[in-house]
């Protein structure tokens, strides 16, 4: 599987999963040894360390490691809104969403003392484009960067992209996290040191790779009022139970949450919050009927949706932390009424199968994986489809990378899917468009293509309405059989301000780490 394909998968799934599921296949370890925190020290638990600290090539699962030390061009608040970062103004120039202008903040210095300039940001973007990281492909259509002034750039793209603010905020780690000119002059050091304009700087002398990462305040930070901690430490704790124990014993203060340990976290008095983000269910890939002729008929795909009792599956797998859905997004495009499109109706499912010429059902091959409870979801669906005559022949791949490869290679007519909420145009590139990784058979639909082309060039004021039409079309086509929203979230001790834990949205399910601050009086 190509590195670009892996990158596209990670934008769809790993953007959403972040560090939540990283420990699924990692052996247990004991909690870290106890130790006191310095005054106003934030101690974070993560399940895996970063392979590199270079923003241009870091895995998005490791975003917090760079967000502490680098400022984004645009800041995505935990509530999903955008606010100024290194850029004070931004927006599209003219019509068509191919030109984008950025005005940079005056007087900003990086941690190494170099100044923020338009020339420096141009150099940064050119580096990210050619670095081969997860976001390099996003800049593939970046045709030119014009420096229109000491603090002003105009970016021209060869194809429209209506979601550039999404990429220039923290979601676009690599693109958004601007590296200093001095850092770019010595790229080899970017893997182990930081060269950003963020609130903190890595203390490399106190850092032990893949164990402990220590950050201290950046004396040059442009927004000193929002430096909330005297020290930030990230401790690597691979096992979920060990991570929870570290929180309960006060050895760490904050971490991502997992619904499998949520009840115990609540019982221990921790602050918990979960946001629906990843839709889990079946991806009915073979819509042209190459391997499974039955799936070429929309009535069959709709029958599969009618045959699923979503509520019972969600309750069994996610408990109160999940919610049923028939949709692919929980952000722009989500329509509450679409969740009533396919009520549990086995009789309706059998009727549609009979009308399509399959009164006795059929057998459908599905590739799955235990990752993020994929196998559990597929087996639950299989039990319900059996009652309408559809037998799932499940091939589980314990190696998630093998699963991705098989799913994307058009060797199976259906697959488990766990896909995180993204802006609709970004989803077109990753989920449902003809070149999307999750569209292995390159399915197309004239109406879907028309709407996506409209979205690509639409002004922001029209994007939500077009996204809703796209989602309605996807649900009607029944290209997928979503079952429920798998929740993502975070845990915190009472030391942390509750707002840092609870303010999240579907497109931003994990908090912006620089927004985490001490509770009042702590």
What are these regions (language model features)?
Residues 37, 308-333, 372-382, 402-522:
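Detector for C-terminal structural segments
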Residues 170-224, 231:
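Gly/Pro-rich hinge or "lid" segments in bacterial periplasmic/extracellular proteins
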Residues 103, 137-181:
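Surface-exposed binding/hinge segments that line
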Residues 200, 291, 322-355, 373:
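Structural transition elements
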Residues 117-124, 150-156, 199, 229-231, ...:
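Alpha-helical secondary-structure segments
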Residues 89-132, 148, 154, 294:
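Aromatic- and charge-enriched surface segment that lines or borders ligand/interaction sites
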Residues 220-264, 391:
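Ligand-site clamp/hinge motif
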Residues 45-93, 126, 195-196:
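N-terminal lobe/hinge region of extracytoplasmic solute-binding protein
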